[in-house]
């Protein structure tokens, strides 16, 4: 891969003979976010290697420049060794020694000059390398700025993803709380409905019972009033009889007259207080009991005076009758008192039931309001669920898009070629047709099928260097051609793709027929056991890739 350029809108990849531009769909910055860390690492590694190279070059230059030329004076010429052994020949050899030293010095100067020229060349080479390194550093600096911008953009995208994850978590928590509230409200609503039904039944039965009891009490009151009127008449008669007997018992019946007067007053007060039953009934009962006592005393006195007052026998019988009637009235008053207490209890029960009914109505209104709020909350939760579903679909689509892009880049890196929505692999090895199909299958593809004139032209142009197997065969179905990838074979459209007099189904010396097809300029049937390069075809459905 010679070149790779990235920007926010497009990714362009070039090899020796093709370029592919990828334009992502949907959320574009996220697709570049995964490539940014790899590019940054590559740039950092290259920059580090270049810096190390420059440092070593400078060290080498410094070491070479810091070593000056030093004459090796400790090495004496062979002629000087004879100086100590032959003193007499010193004058004869002095001229020879000087010439020898001069030659050695000249040779060393020449060596120094050669070393200086080589050092100068190394310095020039290092300067040239330094210039190249500087230009590369500048280029890498510009690329590093672009990468930093992409990294910043990637960080923003990651922040947005984090915020989206937090929002999704919050929505899930709200959904769980709302579900629990809905479940609780449903239980409360069912309890309220059951309580309302029970209250209605109780109110209905209580109302019926109260109506019946009130009806019975009304009749009892009417009967009591009639009996009281009768008692009043009886008391009036008794008063008349008492006034008649008062003259006969003037001396001996003073106490009886006072008691009868007390009874008369008590009966009158009882008659007046019968209109207000709650308070006067108690007073009337006490007066009646008191009258009963007086009547009993009167009866005893009358029994004691029976011998003396034979003329008053009729009065005694009437008094006994009145006494019996008063006892009956007392019993009826006791009954009326109990009935009134029962009526008061019923009234309190009715009031309590009415308050319970009012409270139930209030609770029903509250439950209705809660139900409306629950419905609104349910609608809101449904909307949030729909929004969450849309976000999940968008994330899934983005993941699928990223996966497809990675597949495309991987195929391009493996020398697959893109054309018109499909990827093609042109092999350099040679295999029989069946082995070639196995290889294509192992790559998730099949031997290529041809369905259009443009695809035929593309294969012809790419396979011009030699014959290549394609996925057309009639093996096992002689004369009925089919594509191995399942694509329907269009015989009429494919007639122009065959070579002259092809297919001819030639029989080879080994008896094998030509049941498979290879292509160079046109199609030709060939024995399937022959070895040729092949063309694999893989459909990806990637619509955003374009051939540059």
Swiss-Prot record:
The C-type lectin domain, residue ranges: 438-538
Quote the tissue specificity entry: Kupffer cells.
Q: Which GO terms describe its cellular component?
A: plasma membrane
Q: Extracellular compartment: which residues? A: 70-548
CDD domains reported in the protein's UniProt record: CLECT_DC-SIGN_like
UniProt xrefs under Gene3D superfamilies? 1.20.5.170, Mannose-Binding Protein A, subunit A
What this protein is called in its record is C-type lectin domain family 4 member F
What phylogenetic lineage does the species belong to?
Answer: Eukaryota, Metazoa, Chordata, Craniata, Vertebrata
Gene behind this protein: Clec4f
């Amino acid at each position: 891969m010679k070149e790779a350029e990235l920007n926010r809108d497009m990714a362009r990849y070039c090899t020796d003979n093709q370029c592919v531009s990828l334009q992502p769909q949907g959320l574009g910055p996220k697709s570049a976010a995964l490539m940014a860390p790899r590019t940054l690492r590559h740039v950092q590694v290259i920059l580090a290697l270049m810096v190390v190279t420059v440092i070593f070059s400078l060290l080498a230059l410094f070491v070479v420049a810091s070593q000056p030329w030093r004459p090796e004076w400790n090495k004496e010429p062979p002629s000087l060794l004879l100086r100590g052994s032959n003193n007499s020949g010193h004058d004869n050899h002095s001229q020879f020694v000087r010439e020898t030293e001069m030659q050695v010095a000249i040779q060393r100067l020449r060596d120094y000059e050669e070393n200086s020229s080589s050092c100068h060349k190394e310095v020039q080479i290092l300067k040239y390398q330094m210039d190249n390194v500087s230009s590369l550093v500048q280029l890498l600096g510009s690329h590093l700025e672009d990468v930093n911008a992409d990294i910043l953009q990637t960080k923003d995208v990651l922040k947005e993803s984090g915020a989206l994850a937090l929002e999704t978590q919050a929505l899930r928590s709200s959904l769980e709380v709302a579900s629990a509230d809905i479940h609780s409200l449903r239980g409360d609503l069912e309890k309220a409905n059951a309580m309302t039904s029970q209250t209605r039944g109780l109110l209905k039965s209580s109302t019926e019972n109260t109506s019946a009891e009130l009806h019975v009490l009304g009749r009892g009151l009417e009967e009591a009033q009639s009996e009281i009127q009768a008692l009043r008449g009886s008391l009036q008669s008794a008063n008349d009889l008492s006034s008649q007997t008062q003259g006969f018992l003037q001396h001996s019946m003073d106490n009886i007259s006072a008691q009868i007067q007390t009874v008369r007053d008590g009966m009158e007060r009882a008659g007046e207080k019968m209109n207000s039953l709650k308070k006067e009934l108690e007073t009337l009962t006490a007066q009646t009991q008191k009258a009963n006592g007086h009547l009993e005393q009167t009866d005893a006195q009358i029994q004691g005076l029976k011998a003396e007052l034979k003329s008053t026998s009729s009065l005694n019988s009437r008094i006994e009758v009145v006494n019996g009637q008063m006892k009956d009235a007392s019993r009826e008053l006791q009954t009326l008192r109990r009935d009134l207490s029962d009526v008061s209890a019923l009234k309190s029960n009715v009031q309590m039931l009415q308050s319970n009914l009012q409270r139930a109505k209030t609770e029903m209104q509250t439950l209705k309001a809660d139900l409306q709020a629950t419905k609104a909350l349910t609608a809101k939760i449904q909307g949030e669920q729909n929004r969450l579903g849309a976000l999940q679909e968008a994330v899934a689509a983005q993941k699928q898009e990223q996966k497809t892009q990675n597949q495309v880049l991987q195929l391009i890196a493996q020398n697959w070629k893109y054309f018109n929505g499909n990827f093609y692999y042109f092999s350099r090895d040679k295999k029989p047709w069946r082995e070639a199909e196995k290889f294509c299958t192992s790559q998730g593809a099949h031997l290529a099928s041809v369905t259009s004139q443009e695809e035929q032209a593309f294969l012809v142009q790419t396979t011009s260097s030699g014959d290549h197997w394609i996925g057309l065969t009639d093996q096992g179905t002689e004369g009925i051609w089919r594509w191995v990838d399942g694509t329907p074979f269009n015989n009429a459209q494919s007639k122009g793709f065959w070579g002259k007099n092809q297919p001819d189904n030639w029989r080879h010396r080994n008896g094998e027929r030509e049941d498979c097809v290879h292509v160079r300029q046109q199609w030709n049937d060939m024995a399937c056991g022959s070895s040729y390069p092949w063309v694999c075809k893989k459909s990806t459905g990637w619509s955003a890739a374009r051939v540059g």
